[in-house]
Amino acid sequence: MQFSKMHGLGNDFMVVDAVTQNVYFSPELIRRLADRHLGIGFDQLLIVEPPYDPDLDFHYRIFNADGSEVAQCGNGARCFARFVRLKGLTNKNEIRVSTQSGRMVLSITQDELVCVNMGEPNFEPQQIPFRANKAENIYLMRAAEQTVMCGVVSMGNPHCVLQVDNVKTAAVETLGPVLESHERFPERVNVGFMEVVHREHIRLRVYERGAGETQACGSGACAAVAVGIQQASLAEKVRVDLPGGSLHIAWKGPGHPLYMTGPATHVYDGFIHL
């Protein structure tokens, strides 16, 4: 099976063309391939499938390193767009794809960055899903023997965002796994730790559901900005600094889609016998 290794700001992926190849991945196989000592090593596996709708170009599937399938990955979406162009699967600059959670439009910019229309952030608890009586800008939760304040949103996948004074010293390793599997998130959650530098600049670390802390999380950056705008602490255009680099997020508010722009890097092509 042929594959490519790619990354978006250090969030790394194994990308597989299932348009021209017949492939099947069991959770056990994914876990073996994700192992950085015994396999390829990656945060997520991305699979390019033929479209299910004639109006679309491809279907986009995402699997975490633990073998679980998820509905969204923003950094992966940028790598997906770069991959299908590099492999000659399309020559379009605007690529329309379906995911488990809906549809996305991926646009290649003139300077070879990828702009992703991530759709409109969803703050409705039942659709995140998050156990709450009603939608709030800020929720109080008990975790790791303390009370934390957070915003909760879906970007096609669930996110919990905490504002911290200093992202370098944030309790990512202790609070991250506790909140990820908190009972109020029936499908678990990605946990973002956001430091607001000013209204157009934040620093962010993300503990990803099923993957742990990663170098960058695209949907997490989108979620942090959406929550920051909802809480009136951020402007419409924000630079997000992650451990692996920077993304640019733009959102005009409710009723509008959110856009994420950033790089996608091809590392190497490989072949593995399964």
Curated annotation (Swiss-Prot):
Question: Pathway, per Swiss-Prot/TrEMBL?
Answer: Amino-acid biosynthesis; L-lysine biosynthesis via DAP pathway; DL-2,6-diaminopimelate from LL-2,6-diaminopimelate: step 1/1
- Site (Could be important to modulate the pK values of the two catalytic cysteine residues): give the residues: 159, 208
Q: Where are the transmembrane segments?
A: none
One GO molecular function term of this record is:
diaminopimelate epimerase activity
| Enzyme class, broadest EC rank | isomerase
The entry's active site is 73, 217
The UniProt entry, under HAMAP family, shows: DAP_epimerase
Instruction: Name it.
Output: Diaminopimelate epimerase
